[in-house]
Amino acid sequence: EVVGALDVDLDLDHGELAAFDLLDADVFGLGRALEQVTDQVLEEVLAWQRRPLEALYPVIYLDAIIVKVRDGGHVRNKAAHIAVGVDMDGIKHVLGIWVQQTEGAKFWAAVCAELANRGVRDVLIVCCDGLTGFPDAIAATWPEATVQTCVVHLIRAATRFVSYTDRKSVSAALKPIYQAANEEAALEALEAFTASEFGRRYPSAVKTFTDAWDRFTPFLAFPPELRRVIYTTNSIESLNYQLRKVSKSRGHFPNDQAVVKLLWLAICDIEDKRARARAKERGLPATQRKAGGRLVEGGIVTNWKRALEQLALAYPDRINPHL
């Protein structure tokens, strides 16, 4: 709606601004005018970024994408930090976007503190990457939160130095570790992988898991439905994929504020387009519907009722007052 009101057609599914390219606009002398256009949404962006939040989020996903931002006379890589929360109804919400020079635990601690200031008193499980210092940064705000390393990130790190021809086979060989019934079985699977041909060929893959073991294993204590919710940041990875397409097509952003504004507009535009596509297919048989579901905002976690039941068993004193 905001995008439509501004008459700026963000054709983000193809990674393009159909009406304008905000970053190349200076070449044509349009930079000032386009800055005024995006300034019209700044007030709404700030209201969104500062809005009150729920007291409890059962799960929060934390991640970041790298964007290029003009800084003085240079273009630097900066991290756009993104938080996605799952509320008690299983509905996903983008809680905010923050820009910083690098993705670091110290800055994430500030993000968590800001979320607390906006009303988040407790989080049961925080899913994040394996950044050193992340657990301490989260514990400073939510000391009882379970910190779970994203398994997708972990596998990606474990296969970073694996040859392309072996990558699929190594990924398959790692599955028994993160699909194990419990931590003991996972450790046995890791030992088996370590002794295997792939384990001997790629000791860095073994080290990735051993170094992250304490942050990797929390989800192994939960039943399958809850594991699927917490062991990966897929909810935010799909969002990041779309936002990376936008940022790459831009080349670089003029400043940090432009990053937040454009990424917010991107989220609005993607969700609006998907909603319109679903509306067109309403009434058709499921086999004929091709429109995608919600990207993140307003989407409901699959099998949430069952996952919530398991959360209530695992964290009764913290979750029951909110049921």
Segments (PLM) and residue ranges:
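Acidic/histidine-rich catalytic cores and adjacent linkers
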Residues: 176-323
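N-terminal low-complexity segments that are often proline-rich with Ser/Thr-Pro
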Residues: 1-30
